[in-house]
Amino acid sequence: MKKHLNLLREFSVPLVAGVVVALFWANLDPAGYRAFDSTPFWGSLSFHFISNELFMTLFFGIAAVEITQSCMPGGDLNPISRAVNPLFGTLGGVLGPVLVYLGLNALVGLPELRNGWGIPTATDIALAWLAARMVFGPGHPAVSYLLLLAVADDAIGLAIIALFYPDPNHPVVAAWLLLTLLGMLVAWGLGRRRVRSYWPYILLGGSLSWIGLHQAHLHPALALVFIIPFLPHRLRESRHLFDDDPGDRSPLAQFEHEWKVVVDFGLFLFGLANAGVEFSSIGTVTWLVLVSLLVGKTVGIFGFGLLAERLGFRRPRGMKRRDLLVAGVVAGTGFTVALFVSGSAFSDPVIQAAAKMGAMFSLAAALIGMLLGQLLRIRKVH
């Protein structure tokens, strides 16, 4: 039974199942799907809110664990100078899609679509990370490279939303970020006192961080990203972040061990809540978003990764140039933040729906990455 469950997790079956169910439901009964997804059932709580703002907090927390471990001595991104290359890739992965989008839009001559330039800037952490694990194997340094790139990418995406797509009804209230800072200080203090359970870090520091981001009108799902690095951890002998270490009983390892399975299967909820887009919505902006993600991300990440090398910032150990190219392709998977920006960039519901279709179609980047990985004979590392 455990073997079968691990197989489902390995091939991201829960997430794929959620996406498929949402697509069928939204196209067969769009009104019913929208009512299920967005209708509050207790106060302001809806299925969409629970999935995106509460459950995804755990997902980003697990992602933060992987980044923390990869930055430890012996990790794929240690010494920290090795993180400079993926951060360069992040910059290229933002600028590339923006330039491609604006360039293509200038060619088609539709000024009403110009405001969508921010849609293809972010990489979907959940889907890109899972696709990378399938392409490279969970122990490949390209996975932690792409994970760091995707997290930084989404941080830039959220900044773009706050700066360029403000909601007049819910403007950013920066003062509330002091509460997130307080949460970080609480987590730091718990670490100084050598608290050996992860629960106080999550319940105290995590709650403060979540409330601060929520009240600031930013994405509260990123709350644990600011808390996880403060959890006490043990240095691992293995340099691969996905290697299991049964002797590691540190708070960081316990959090990962106890919540990773929950997150892997809970991604069904994420797919169900976000993938309900009608196929009849396809329009010009669909292709602008899709091409910007597929081409802009690949060229930008690969080009800026090579530029970082020229400047003396090497890739992680064991990561070849062909791995960087494939990682750039996989990073073209735009989803969550792209869907969110689509709703902020356009007020016209027809254009908005078409833009969301482009974000949905970018799931093809994961498939293209897998095929390219086979063609380039990428060796999986488990």
From Swiss-Prot:
Q: What does it catalyze?
A: Na(+)(in) + 2 H(+)(out) = Na(+)(out) + 2 H(+)(in)
Where in or outside the cell it occurs: the entry states: Cell inner membrane
Please give the biological process terms from Gene Ontology that the record holds: regulation of pH
Q: Which InterPro entries match?
A: Na/H_antiporter_dom_sf (IPR023171), NhaA (IPR004670)
Q: Name one GO molecular function term.
A: sodium:proton antiporter activity
Which Pfam families does its entry note? Na_H_antiport_1
What is this entry's stated membrane topology? Multi-pass membrane protein
Which Gene Ontology cellular-component terms appear in the entry?
Answer: plasma membrane
What residue intervals traverse the membrane?
11-31, 45-65, 91-111, 116-136, 145-165, 171-191, 197-214, 287-307, 324-344, 353-373
What are the entry keywords? Antiport, Cell inner membrane, Cell membrane, Ion transport, Membrane, Sodium, Sodium transport, Transmembrane, Transmembrane helix, Transport
Please give the family membership noted in the entry. Answer: Belongs to the NhaA Na(+)/H(+) (TC 2.A.33) antiporter family.
Role according to the record: Na(+)/H(+) antiporter that extrudes sodium in exchange for external protons.
The protein, known as: Na(+)/H(+) antiporter NhaA 2
Q: Which organism is it from?
A: Pelobacter propionicus (strain DSM 2379 / NBRC 103807 / OttBd1)
The gene behind this protein is nhaA2
